[in-house]
Amino acid sequence: ISECLVGSEMCIRDRFRDFGCHNFTMIVNYKKGMIKSYFNELEKDYNVDFADEEVFMGTGGGLCLLKGKIKAPFFFTNCDTLLDVDFGDIYEYHKSHGNLVTMICAFKHYTVPYGVVELGENGSIAAMREKPELDFLTNTGVYVVEPRVVEEMRDGEKIGFPDVIERYRRAGEKVGVYPISESSWMDMGQLEELEKMRRKLENQQ
């Protein structure tokens, strides 16, 4: 787990807590003893439960460990993603749109640092673009999920959560997107982004 500290604060959990989330469940595998010990000794105003993943099952497979425990729509997040958003608004958006899963996606603008060549027939050049600029939505790794998804997870299946979503989408289920700005998403899994995030949060304190 890579829950980020700024000073002595647990960033991800604090953001959810600020919007009224007080019950957290962590699916733990690597160094789970250390993680449990830390939270058991921590003075906190929220509850943390643990689900032990004995064999790594991907970002989605571990949800099968929560069967029978989830009774309402819930936030499901990777442990290296921090969003500067109104989680209450996202939750209401999910419910009002009747989604089975709502994926929170960030707008992204990217300039390709090279000239791009499109290949035509017989090795010819079909088109050339010098350092094209792209605009797209990217998955932040944060979702709002209906409890039904947990109950329908296959026991012991190794699967990423985006693949779980794709399975439902192909079956005709309603899956939606909540778009956020690029600046609202901080990916702590990238060292450069982690440093940017630290500076941003420290400036907010």
Named regions from a protein language model:
Residues 15-21:
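Short, acidic, metal-binding catalytic loop of nucleotide-sugar glycosyltransferases
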Residues 9, 22-24, 47, 100, ...:
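Residues at the starts of beta-strands that form the adenosine-phosphate
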Residues 74-75, 82, 88-95, 108-111, ...:
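Catalytic-core segments of class I nucleotidyltransferases/pyrophosphorylases
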Residues 11, 49-51, 178:
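General small-molecule cofactor/ligand-binding pocket signal
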Residues 3-4, 18, 44, 68, ...:
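Solvent-exposed polar/charged
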Residues 36, 40-121:
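Conserved beta-loop-beta/alpha segment of the NTase-like Rossmann-fold superfamily
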Residues 22-30, 51:
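Short beta-strand/loop segment that forms part of the nucleotide-sugar
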Residues 1-12:
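Single conserved hydrophobic/aromatic residue that forms the stacking wall/gate
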